[in-house]
Amino acid sequence: MPNKKEAWKEGMYGDEVREKLLEFAEEGWESIPEDERDMWFSRFKFWGVFHHRSGQESYFMMRLANTNGVLEPGQLRAIGEVARDYADGPVENPEFGDTWIDLTTRQSIQLHWLKLEDIPEIWEKLEAVGVSSRSAGGDTMRNISGCPVAGRDKHEFVDSQPVLDEISTKLRGDDSLASMPRKFNISVTGCREGCAQDSINGIGLEPAAKAVDSRDVRGFNVRVGGGLGGREPRRARSLDVFVEPDRAYDVVRAFVELYFDNGNRENRQKNRSRFFVDEWGTERIRDLLQREYVDFELRRAGRNLREEYTYNAGRPAEAGKHDHVGVHEQTDGRYYVGLSVPVGRLTATETIELADLADEHGSGAVRLTRRQNPLVVDVPEDEVDALLDAELLETHRPEPSVFTRGAMACTGTEFCSLALTETKARMAVMLRWLRANVELPDDVSQIKLHYSGCTADCGQAMTADIGFQGMRARKNGEMVEALDVGVGGGIGAEPSFVEWIRQRVPADEVPGLLRNLLEAFAAHREAGQTFRQWVDATGEESLVEFAEPEETDYEDPCLTDAKQSWYPFDDGESPAPTDARGEPISADD
């Protein structure tokens, strides 16, 4: 029997939801019947509109959809202006202030504290420059990820941008496929670094070559059934298919349709595509695709480039960082400059400043990476130094510290109904403490620190050198925010997921744990050994011993909140719900 969300989707989903959302926006928050709010909030997600967590009633988040992290000239500025004019909540975050944007791990952008009544104006402003929020959430195909410098990468193996554009336009734009069994992630990359992380997507196209009719043809191998979340991660498995670029869309569509037709619509705990691949197996899937979903012969897999992957691969410094941060030459002789934005949060002012810099020193275009960082592209060589001297780059540096460079964090309890802990402000404070209190050998260039507020793992803790997932614990008789700590994750040629070595560590003891663990790494590693290599070579018992929790002078920003307040940094009474002007709505209104 289908679950209730399937019943809701059968009643209305996809493009038709937009008109109803606009109707509610015109009539105001209170026009949504209270006993129907869960249903409408679930439907709104298709249009990237998410209601905030309990205690923040009438406030919404909007997630945008920009395939492959592409922001054309004028788009980032419009987003920054929307954040400035509309993303202003009733309280300030003590770490970030108010009016900001969040860069995501799928190369998109999220705006918070939006009022339902403002959404029509917000859509009008964004859509005027070609920015949409359609298909950015819910049970649908999410933002398609890829190499952010596709078509510009000097060392690119095959240009994936045309494939990405075709999939986005024809597949994600197809309303008949809007209601998938569950959210579905697609990645396509033609680069040699593996930065699109094909291993953790529902379907991923990776660069490959194959001899076809005595020609060495470049194209893609196909992997299916990858993903994180629920402490049940899966590596995407080879479908044993090689596809040329002009057939790539057809193969992706075929697998999407197969999952659409046959995916589990009853048990939401077991209906992600990774479980579908578990149940069916790649041989059966390949056979059915060939017989019923494509009208051309599926070739066997070609030679992949996985051994070259360096993106979050735990490889030595001499292999390169390949996270797109820093100054890099493009194929046309111009350059792109990648900024490091800790935890992916830019103020509205910084966002507009970044758009100014892109206009002044580049083509105006900006790209977003899967590490929550922006790239200014198309910078002539004689403009690079001027860009590097810009004040904004003193804050978001192209050559950041080891810890800052590797940090990512999800939304956390600030807004998310699933999260158990605050994430972004805590990570920012921890990064400052680590920079001041932990020294690493000169040849250690990266430590990936990923923080997810719950086991859904939107912050990709499972693929970190050191991953954190939010929990709760008791300390001195009081409920506090706590973290599970895992080590040894990564992507690369052979993806691995963290081993959880400490559970429910009070958040104020985690920095001390990190210092103890990293000092042990520095003391016991072999020359040139990366953290991931050291973890692989060190027994679990020793790792647990090294990772001893410890209280230090670190002051946690919201240790005792444990989601007991309406906002992690305000234990007063919630002002929500509010009207279109942000004024509280009384029970008598």
Language model segments and positions:
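Peripheral terminal and linker regions in Fe-S/redox and tRNA-modifying enzymes
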Residues: 1-589
